């Protein structure tokens, strides 16, 4: 047993220190990033925010809506090959280039991914997703997928430390997904005692990834636009959002009426709700590690994503970053014990 004494930080522990800026307006800030990925050599241009691969967020409808903003969607893995064929038939490359094909690590998952990717050359992203990215099985699976798809962009996770980021990149991942337990409907930290404060995880993992020419996704922990900016400021190349994009008509969640008001069900992918739906219940050897909540129905996602991106632009103006890629270089975080004045409640 050993104890690390260094303090690790979450988004609530810091604020940006404002800096002199020559920008006159938020409209001058460029959020588009251009990436060339390490192993695949693929190029991608867009706004590096990703809707999470949860079946009450990462739907086909979400992918179509967010592509209008240049934003990506990690489409959840529970669509069938036939579902994908229909989606591909109805949408062009401008939508498909922003859709990630999510997969687990079983042999059936591998075959399904091959079948989906064979439908079109316009799909370029594969998201390999398991809860515990520290498994040697994941490293071996990344190697297998890389051998099968040498020209596709592969994301793999989730992990929270630089050593595992490096191992996954060396195995063939272009992008590593960072985050264990910070999500709004994730209870892994409570059920297992395992986790890592998200901002420190991003800072440390970004350093490891960038040293090898890889990229990271900050996955989870964001509850407001300011948190998204903090993730970018900490070095995240992409930021993945679940709860902030849940509850919309494009989210794919179940709509429930109570007392004349509409709500949408939102749940973690290791929750009892998810396992009842997709796995026939919680296996005897495991515990559910997610919660189920009802969110007030929020209408179209277009207003929400515009508000989030507007907040990130505003952050950039406060620190003098004319482009999103400059934000981390312009970032100085100050440690704080307060974030906002809640005398009239939270927004």
From Swiss-Prot:
GO terms of biological process kind: purine nucleotide metabolic process
Q: Which GO terms describe its molecular function?
A: GMP reductase activity; metal ion binding
Query: What's the gene?
Result: guaC
Reaction catalysed?
IMP + NH4(+) + NADP(+) = GMP + NADPH + 2 H(+)
Full protein name: GMP reductase
Which keywords fit this entry according to its UniProt record? Metal-binding, NADP, Oxidoreductase, Potassium
Annotated positions binding K(+) = 181, 183
Q: Name any GO cellular component annotation.
A: cytosol
Q: Which residues form the active site?
A: 186
Report the Gene3D superfamilies cross-referenced here.
Aldolase class I
| Its job | Catalyzes the irreversible NADPH-dependent deamination of GMP to IMP. It functions in the conversion of nucleobase, nucleoside and nucleotide derivatives of G to A nucleotides, and in maintaining the intracellular balance of A and G nucleotides.
Q: What is its EC number?
A: 1.7.1.7
Record SMART domains: IMPDH
Provide an example Pfam family for this protein. IMPDH
Q: Which family does it belong to?
A: Belongs to the IMPDH/GMPR family. GuaC type 1 subfamily.
User: Does the entry feature the keyword NADP, yes or no?
Assistant: yes
Q: Output the HAMAP family linked to this UniProt entry.
A: GMP_reduct_type1 (MF_00596)
Ranked from the top, the taxonomy reads:
Bacteria, Pseudomonadati, Pseudomonadota, Gammaproteobacteria, Vibrionales
Entries under SUPFAM superfamilies matching the protein: Inosine monophosphate dehydrogenase (IMPDH)
Indicate which residues the UniProt annotation says bind NADP(+): 108-131, 216-239
> How the protein assembles, per its UniProt entry?
Homotetramer.
Q: PROSITE patterns recorded for this chain?
A: IMP_DH_GMP_RED
